[in-house]
Amino acid sequence: MTKRTLGGTNRKRKRVSGFRVRMRSHTGRRVIRTRRKRGRARLAA
């Protein structure tokens, strides 16, 4: 049996699509705004 290698890394996930990263750019802020408007429970990763 082979191992499942696509585990996912929390550090990378936060660095790429975390809240603070989103707030840095204009388009990232737009993402947060849209998700707030839709009433998402989680705005960012």
From Swiss-Prot:
Any Gene Ontology CC annotation? ribosome
Q: Which InterPro entries match?
A: Ribosomal_bL34 (IPR000271), Ribosomal_bL34_CS (IPR020939)
GO terms of biological process kind: translation
What keywords are assigned to this protein?
Ribonucleoprotein, Ribosomal protein
- Name the domain of life this protein comes from: Bacteria
Q: Which Pfam families match?
A: Ribosomal_L34 (PF00468)
Q: Which GO terms describe its molecular function?
A: structural constituent of ribosome
Q: Per the database entry, which stretches of residues form a coiled coil?
A: none
Say yes or no: keyword Methyltransferase present: no
Q: Which family is this sequence assigned to? A: Belongs to the bacterial ribosomal protein bL34 family.
UniProt name for this protein = Large ribosomal subunit protein bL34
State the species of origin.
Synechococcus sp. (strain CC9605)
Lineage of producing organism: Bacteria, Bacillati, Cyanobacteriota, Cyanophyceae, Synechococcales
